[in-house]
From Swiss-Prot:
Positions with biased composition (Basic and acidic residues): 15-28
Family: Belongs to the light-harvesting chlorophyll a/b-binding (LHC) protein family.
Record keyword Magnesium present: yes
Modification after translation, per record: Photoregulated by reversible phosphorylation of its threonine residues.
Location in or out of the cell: Plastid, Chloroplast thylakoid membrane
Cofactor binding, per record: Binds at least 14 chlorophylls (8 Chl-a and 6 Chl-b) and carotenoids such as lutein and neoxanthin.
Residues given in the record as chlorophyll a 2 binding sites: 26
Residues that, per the record, bind chlorophyll a 1: 23
MF (Gene Ontology): chlorophyll binding; metal ion binding
Binding partners and assembly: The LHC complex consists of chlorophyll a-b binding proteins.
Name the UniProt record assigns to this protein: Chlorophyll a-b binding protein 3, chloroplastic
Domain comment quoted from the record: The N-terminus of the protein extends into the stroma where it is involved with adhesion of granal membranes and post-translational modifications; both are believed to mediate the distribution of excitation energy between photosystems I and II.
Amino acid sequence: TTKPVPSGSPWYGPDRVKNRELEVIHSR
């Protein structure tokens, strides 16, 4: 799920959760 979000803008809704999951995966 990718949306055109301006740089510096926080993620909102499910997209933010998905982004968090991706961060966790990359953190491994």
